[in-house]
Amino acid sequence: MAGATVTVEEVRKAQRATGPATVLAIGTATPANCVHQADYPDYYFRITKSEHMTDLKEKFKRMCDKSQIRKRYMHLTEEYLAENPNMCAYMAPSLDARQDIVVVEVPKLGKAAAQKAIKEWGQPKSKITHLVFCTTSGVDMPGADYQLTKMLGLRPSVNRLMMYQQGCFAGGTVLRVAKDLAENNRGARVLVVCSEITAVTFRGPSESHLDSMVGQALFGDGAAAVIVGADPDKRVECPLFQLVSASQTILPDSEGAIDGHLREVGLTFHLLKDVPGLISKNIERSLEEAFKPLGITDYNSIFWVAHPGGPAILDQVEAKVGLKKERMRATRHVLSEYGNMSSACVLFILDEMRKRSAEEGQATTGEGFDWGVLFGFGPGLTVETVVLHSVPITIAAITA
């Protein structure tokens, strides 16, 4: 019997990519139903039959006014909510009705974003080797990853990973996972999809649960998809951002700061007041660990993609690090135009940044800067930190 002619080390070397994981395309999608923030308090208290709670409505109006959100997109329409009054109550059994929506609509919205990313990528979908799907909106088996594989007509042998109930930091998580997949599997092309629908969290107001109302004032629906791969074929692929490093950490003394619990009443949301303070207090440590090896200490010399959990988080991070207002421009634009879409937000911000950089004639996809940071913040408190490197803007990037 002949023995092996190669070593394990040789096999491993052949399996690994040569260069870093790279974002090759981005696509986004929202439901058709658009809700303007200025009109939302009246709509919300009317549809939940809570107009008698006048003081609470005034509080909610102030929350919406301070949110820095102009509009959001929501799958839930007034007609659907009228047919499902338990979803409008504060704590009525309603999980079945919520699940019936998100199990169908989460992969469907993800498909719309994925199709845009695949079209921009310009390669046959048969070249997709891996699928990473992330949502905090409902749970099912087989999962949304399976449903999307069927919807898109991906190969049955595509390697799938389904990530449920991660929360708002997960836009960073999926990039970290995609980076590892792309760099450890030569030739891999990873389709990453984050799809979020607030049907699982929508509920009426309560005097005893004001942090739930914060969520009602902030959250919106959206899906984003990216194609990630290493060693791009420059003849047919157009790199956008390189994923240089990625890490995750739990912030000290932050247990219980952000919690979500899936119960018979849906997904309940709990938030401590000092979340912005906890994040800003620890942000410099994350930046130092990520950028000290690169010799970067001026955080105004990099581009920023930060999960817009709310304006207070962005304000306090800016103040703590001494950021110029324009560093968070793309982040604040996405917050204003879409609200907090949980895991999908940072991918929307990447899309906004590369498009605006091209439109303004910047030298790189990162607002003219070479290096950048992407932050995900969420339950735990968990922080994802991804170091990015932009690429020079080409004609292909401008016309994408």
Swiss-Prot record:
Transmembrane segments: none annotated. The active site is at C168. GO terms for biological process: flavonoid biosynthetic process. One of its GO terms (molecular function) is naringenin-chalcone synthase activity. Pfam families: Chal_sti_synt_C (PF02797), Chal_sti_synt_N (PF00195). Pathway: Secondary metabolite biosynthesis; flavonoid biosynthesis. It catalyses: (E)-4-coumaroyl-CoA + 3 malonyl-CoA + 3 H(+) = 2',4,4',6'-tetrahydroxychalcone + 3 CO2 + 4 CoA. It comes from the Eukaryota. It is an enzyme of class 2 (transferase). Its EC number is 2.3.1.74. SUPFAM superfamilies: Thiolase-like (SSF53901). InterPro entries: Chalcone/stilbene_synt_C (IPR012328), Chalcone/stilbene_synt_N (IPR001099), Chalcone/stilbene_synthase_AS (IPR018088), Polyketide_synthase_type-III (IPR011141), Thiolase-like (IPR016039). Keywords: Acyltransferase, Flavonoid biosynthesis, Transferase. Belongs to the thiolase-like superfamily. Chalcone/stilbene synthases family. The primary product of this enzyme is 4,2',4',6'-tetrahydroxychalcone (also termed naringenin-chalcone or chalcone) which can under specific conditions spontaneously isomerize into naringenin. This is Chalcone synthase 7. It comes from Sorghum bicolor. The gene is CHS7.
